[in-house]
């Protein structure tokens, strides 16, 4: 569990941003999404449109209408309307066990 005294390393944040699959994240959040023509389309948490896709190379989700990008941490903050530490705590379960933070 995250709190104001939790130390989060740069490497751990990099893993959360780069190694959490958006398909898994959307399923975990029960966020509307679908695969269509090789794209992972989702409902934008800001404008509610679906002019969206996920770039697998950069692991960024993008809304072309809003012109916004999200990494998994940013998306979790936007969908749940929570702060950074809460988002990091939510995402830990989506990392493979070997990559989870150790205390």
Predicted regions: what they are:
Residues 1-103:
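N-terminal structured subdomain of primase-like DNA metabolism proteins
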């Amino acid at each position: 569990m995250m709190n104001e005294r939790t130390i989060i390393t740069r490497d751990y944040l990099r893993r959360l941003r780069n190694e959490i699959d958006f398909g898994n994240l959307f399923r975990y959040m029960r966020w509307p999404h679908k695969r269509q023509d090789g794209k992972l389309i989702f409902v934008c948490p800001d404008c509610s449109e679906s002019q969206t896709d996920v770039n697998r190379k950069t692991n960024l989700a993008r809304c072309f209408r809003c012109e916004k990008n999200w990494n998994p941490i940013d998306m979790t903050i936007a969908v749940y309307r929570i702060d950074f530490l809460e988002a990091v705590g939510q995402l830990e379960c989506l990392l493979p066990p070997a990559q989870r933070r150790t205390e």
